[in-house]
Amino acid sequence: MVREEITGSTQKLEWKCVESRVDSKRLYYGRFILSPLRKGQADTVGIALRRALLGEIEGTCITRAKFGNVPHEYSTIVGIEESIQEILLNLKEIVLRSNLYGVRDASICVKGPRYITAQDIILPPSVEIVDTAQPIANLREPIDFCIELQIKRDRGYHTELRKNSQDGSYPIDAVFMPVRNVNYSIFSCGNGNEKHEILFLEIWTNGSLTPKEALYEASRNLIDLFLPFIHTEEEGTSFEESKNRLTPPLLTFQKRFTNLKKNKKGIPLNCIFIDQLELPSRTYNCLKRANIHTLLDLLSKTEEDLMRINSFRMEDGKLIWDTLEKHLPIDLPKNKFSL
């Protein structure tokens, strides 16, 4: 790495990736630098990014497994080397990559004798396995073996109290954290009043996304977190004015779209998917996270409902409104999402 002397405080901040490698299918590493920073800024940015990387990035995991005729998780099945508990632990380690939202079903159905690996999981189209060689179980005898699985995308670490299942279904402690570890360090350079800092950031991921992708997503999450303050300052509104603005009159979309239901030539709104609105991916993903999949789902929401969606911004609301106004064959009220 070539280090350049920082001589002025007016230089533009720049990110650089100084090292990137793949140690294994489930271990990616990236090293980045941000410079030049004033004294104290590197620590501020480093702490915020580390927390966002470890706690705010979404991941996909297997969250439940259902076996047939199994009284408890410590049971063993004749012809299988591992106990049910060991199989559950192996399923917990499976690393998945997806952009799904909500819960999806998957399954394993094989006949022994053979080794069962992650490659044997039958997945929905939107999910893929990072390392297909991850072991699950060893069938020693010619038996049929089936497991029903549930897959979910979320963030953080989720645990669920295990009880003796009557139907053979058991929860799996899910680690929705694709970033395994984050370290940052600070290097000071310059003299006197021209002293500056360089932030070094190291990121390890589980292979479901690259360190660069993780850094981008964490940065976007932090930006979205501070956008409300920026908008308030730009518009010159006081705190009281801002508070009043955050409680706008409810938009009862249902009345406005009564005519739409009649004018769509018999096409029900629950058959018009939000994919057809051609929204930007960020806005689209916000709606999908809130289980808004069709136009009927969208039009049943008030403005307050939409603004409660995580990472949903006023610009997203305005964009949705403009899109509906452009494409729907009715007159819509103007400026409901004023910026």
Swiss-Prot record:
It is an enzyme of class 2 (transferase). The keyword S-adenosyl-L-methionine does not apply. It holds the Pfam family RNA_pol_A_bac. GO terms for cellular component: chloroplast; DNA-directed RNA polymerase complex; mitochondrion. Its EC number is 2.7.7.6. Residues 1-233 are annotated as: Alpha N-terminal domain (alpha-NTD). It is found in: Plastid, Chloroplast. SUPFAM superfamilies: C-terminal domain of RNA polymerase alpha subunit, Insert subdomain of RNA polymerase alpha subunit, RBP11-like subunits of RNA polymerase. Keywords: Chloroplast, DNA-directed RNA polymerase, Nucleotidyltransferase, Plastid, Transcription, Transferase. Its main location: plastid. It comes from the Eukaryota. GO terms for molecular function: DNA binding; DNA-directed RNA polymerase activity; protein dimerization activity. DNA-dependent RNA polymerase catalyzes the transcription of DNA into RNA using the four ribonucleoside triphosphates as substrates. The N-terminal domain is essential for RNAP assembly and basal transcription, whereas the C-terminal domain is involved in interaction with transcriptional regulators and with upstream promoter elements. This is DNA-directed RNA polymerase subunit alpha. The lineage of its organism: Eukaryota, Viridiplantae, Streptophyta, Embryophyta, Tracheophyta. The gene is rpoA.
